[in-house]
């Protein structure tokens, strides 16, 4: 995504 930790929960 765009945020700093927006993709860690995948």
UniProtKB/Swiss-Prot annotation:
Its cofactor is Cu cation. It catalyses: 4 hydroquinone + O2 = 4 benzosemiquinone + 2 H2O. On the 2D-gel the determined pI of this protein is: 4.56, its MW is: 62.03 kDa. The keyword Glycoprotein applies. Lignin degradation and detoxification of lignin-derived products. GO terms for biological process: lignin catabolic process. Optimum pH is 5.3. Belongs to the multicopper oxidase family. Binds 4 Cu cations per monomer. GO terms for cellular component: extracellular region. Keywords: Copper, Glycoprotein, Lignin degradation, Metal-binding, Oxidoreductase, Secreted. It comes from Cerrena unicolor (Canker rot fungus). It comes from the Eukaryota. It is an enzyme of class 1 (oxidoreductase). This is Laccase-2. GO terms for molecular function: hydroquinone:oxygen oxidoreductase activity; metal ion binding. Its EC number is 1.10.3.2. Optimum temperature is 60 degrees Celsius.
């Amino acid at each position: 995504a765009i945020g700093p930790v927006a993709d860690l929960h995948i």
